[in-house]
Amino acid sequence: MRIYYDFKKDIGFNFLIYKEDYLDKIGKRFNLINEIEINDSEFDKVFIIKSNDESLVKKVLCKSIKEFLIMNRMYLANFKLDKEKNTTVLNLNAPFDENNLTHMEDVLSFMKKTIDIIVGFNTKTNANNKQA
């Protein structure tokens, strides 16, 4: 299942979070993978994080977001914020059970919280740029 949100503009920030696999472990061993670590040993051990803004991705990965991703790591294909054409889209790709309404509510709540965090950062960034 793919759940996505279109921000209707390019917000200039992107990230990709996905479950670390065997090939990633080899790549990390030989310094072939450039990843961001967030100083959370459980999360860093399970996921690969890539972004164009390390400090912002660390802010997005608040406790509740990390907990959701850890809890659903068996299902997660990837979670990304990326530019598509002239807009930025937040995607959550995972084989969720759409018949489990409680789980779907949790997924939608997770997406809303992530969107609110990103919109909040983007609003602050735009306000700071106007003052400069």
Residues covered by each model-derived region:
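Charged, low-complexity intrinsically disordered regions
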Residues: R2-A132
